[in-house]
Design a protein with these regions (language model features):
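Active-site neighborhoods and metal-handling regions in enzymes and metal-associated proteins
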Residues: 1-241
Length: 241
């Protein structure tokens, strides 16, 4: 993370060094009361404001949300328990989400479990808690209320569960994954061994360091998978399960 107090949102996006690779949606950096899909507009990164941001290359959107602070002491008084009351339960729910990413699981069951883990009156999740991703960021979703669609090997799934609260703002652990049965994992290891090794290494990190329940059928596609840094001016502080 390259966020620094006082820099503009344009400078922050430049620090991401997107580099010209094809994008699945525009880059977002929404600071303060800016709409959630806002692009940079010249706002300054100011201590004590909420912020969300994403960069979406084809096949995976990386999005995070938190507060422009270094510790809970710099949060608004009403939000001082942001981690305990909001961000930490969300991280545990994302562990539950990972555990469900197995061939044969019904999409409606994922929706039900996410609504149970993230009660609406506190977390306000309204969009599908996860969806398919491709060249476009949002393709379609088997995860919805009452869905009988079955998760299948080969699905590129976006962990996209968006909470919102009037006091706590938001939090996010959004990255791309692939659901892969044993045949697909064997094919990947044979044809693209370096990719397979990176996926395995990240899954181990998520299990052993963060404490998440990541099945062997879920392949993480980024080195940000599993990371929630609630205090954006001190990203070395990350949450664990």
């Amino acid at each position: 993370f390259g966020f620094r107090p006082g820099m503009t949102d344009f400078q922050a996006v430049e620090a991401a060094r997107i580099g010209g690779l094809p994008l699945g949606c525009h880059a977002v950096l929404a600071v303060g009361d800016a709409p959630g899909l806002a692009s940079p507009s010249g706002r300054h990164l100011t201590l004590g404001l909420p912020a969300s941001f994403n960069i979406c290359h084809w096949g995976a959107n990386i999005c995070r949300s938190g507060w422009m602070v270094r510790s809970a002491d710099e949060l608004p008084v009403a939000a001082r328990d942001y981690v305990e009351a909001f961000a930490a339960p969300y991280v545990q729910a994302m562990s539950d989400w990972c555990a469900l990413m197995r061939p044969g699981v019904v999409g409606g069951a994922v929706w039900r479990d996410m609504m149970r883990a993230l009660p609406f009156d506190r977390f306000g999740v309204t969009l599908n808690p996860g969806h398919l991703i491709g060249l476009d960021e949002w393709v379609s979703s088997p995860i919805r209320e009452g869905s009988t669609d079955v998760l299948a090997s080969g699905m590129a799934m976006q962990m996209d569960v968006i909470p919102g609260h009037a006091v706590y703002g938001s939090t996010r652990m959004e990255d791309g994954y692939v659901i892969a049965d044993s045949d697909l994992r064997a094919t990947l290891a044979r044809d693209y061994p370096n990719v397979a090794r990176r996926c395995d290494a990240r899954a181990r990190f998520m299990r052993e360091v963060i404490g998440m329940d990541v099945p062997e059928t879920l392949l993480p596609l980024a080195d940000t998978c599993g990371i929630v840094a609630p205090f954006l001016f001190d990203p070395a502080q990350v949450l664990i399960c």
